[in-house]
């Protein structure tokens, strides 16, 4: 199957769940990499808002944390966020775009059936996940000469969500239209 010149031989099965729990990373996934600051928007807010409006439960699943002794050590090395609370900065980003969070590094419903620390979700969206579409262009954040940090390509992710039955065709067209207006 090809969409806009992007071809895939993956045969996506249709999800039969009415409401999905979706765990989403933050840096490189919702925004560009600029830790400990919040990076630039890359379209995640459009897709995640659409998913939340359809009733899907969004869990922020990130390495960001509230201040602690470890993060105080990071301050000494010049790694500070705007509010000195990297996790709260990410939570505030979701609130700014009207995206309700079902959980933060936690799935509240799983505690009744497991003690596992891994957050349970039906789907994980993370720039480090195998197969996630990434954008390598316009990279301004070069940490060293051999490492460029790509970020998630949200138009392609929305197409994958459509292909798998999570979004409707109209949802996809709304997302692409909004993406074209903003970016």
Describe the predicted segments one by one.
Residues 2-183:
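HAD-like aspartate-dependent phosphatase fold
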